[in-house]
Amino acid sequence: MALKELFDRDWQELESEGILFSNLEKLVAWGRSNSLWPATFGLACCAIEMMSSTNARNDMARFGSEVFRASPRQADVMIVAGRLSKKMAPVMRRVYDQMPDPKWVIAMGACASSGGMFNNYAIVQNVDSVVPVDIYVPGCPPRPEALIYAVMQLQKKVRGEAFDQLGHQLPMVDAWTR
């Protein structure tokens, strides 16, 4: 088929024959969203729930987050699970700075999102004051399904889609973004 004939045809007709039209940004965003490689920063009891999100029952690998990366240089998502002490904050910032761009952060649990239920002088009250957070997962500790939902919402954010079918941001009870 000549190139001129291809451009003269209707878009719907070409799509029905299996020819897809997109731009490079959308294709790269689709690839990034379906191959998020998380680096774990498990600090407390939320880390146990984070580990259970990869077991056979929950299987986070279905969504492209197959293996937790041991090195931040191989990861593009940091999952901060649990409380962050003020002594550990510079270490977490260093790990975040070692991640290649583009990078995203999920704050998992009440401690990572708001400092926890108890006001403690040694705990950072919001991880967002150390690194920029993209998705918050509330709960103490949140269930593995909540983390998987947050990963799915992060995939939508990476692709540049709306968060839900109604056009609203994420509900606060499940996960939310800033």
Curated annotation (Swiss-Prot):
Major subcellular location class:
membrane
Gene3D superfamilies xrefs: 3.40.50.12280
Any keyword Lipoprotein?
no
Q: Which SUPFAM superfamilies match?
A: HydA/Nqo6-like (SSF56770)
Instruction: Give the domain of life.
Output: Bacteria
Where does it localize? Cell membrane
Reaction catalysed by this enzyme: a quinone + NADH + 5 H(+)(in) = a quinol + NAD(+) + 4 H(+)(out)
- A GO BP term, please? electron transport coupled proton transport
Pfam families membership? Oxidored_q6
Cofactor binding remark: Binds 1 [4Fe-4S] cluster.
Q: Where is the signal peptide?
A: none
Q: Which GO terms describe its cellular component?
A: plasma membrane; respiratory chain complex I
Sorted UniProt keywords: 4Fe-4S, Cell membrane, Iron, Iron-sulfur, Membrane, Metal-binding, NAD, Quinone, Translocase, Transport
Q: Which cofactor does it need?
A: [4Fe-4S] cluster
- Membrane protein topology class: Peripheral membrane protein
Q: Name one GO molecular function term.
A: NADH dehydrogenase (ubiquinone) activity
Q: Which HAMAP family match?
A: NDH1_NuoB
Quaternary structure, per UniProt, is: NDH-1 is composed of 15 different subunits. Subunits NuoB, C, D, E, F, and G constitute the peripheral sector of the complex.
Say which family it is in: Belongs to the complex I 20 kDa subunit family.
> Function, please?
NDH-1 shuttles electrons from NADH, via FMN and iron-sulfur (Fe-S) centers, to quinones in the respiratory chain. The immediate electron acceptor for the enzyme in this species is believed to be a menaquinone. Couples the redox reaction to proton translocation (for every two electrons transferred, four hydrogen ions are translocated across the cytoplasmic membrane), and thus conserves the redox energy in a proton gradient.
- Could you identify this protein by its name? NADH-quinone oxidoreductase subunit B
Lineage, uppermost ranks: Bacteria, Thermotogati, Deinococcota, Deinococci, Deinococcales
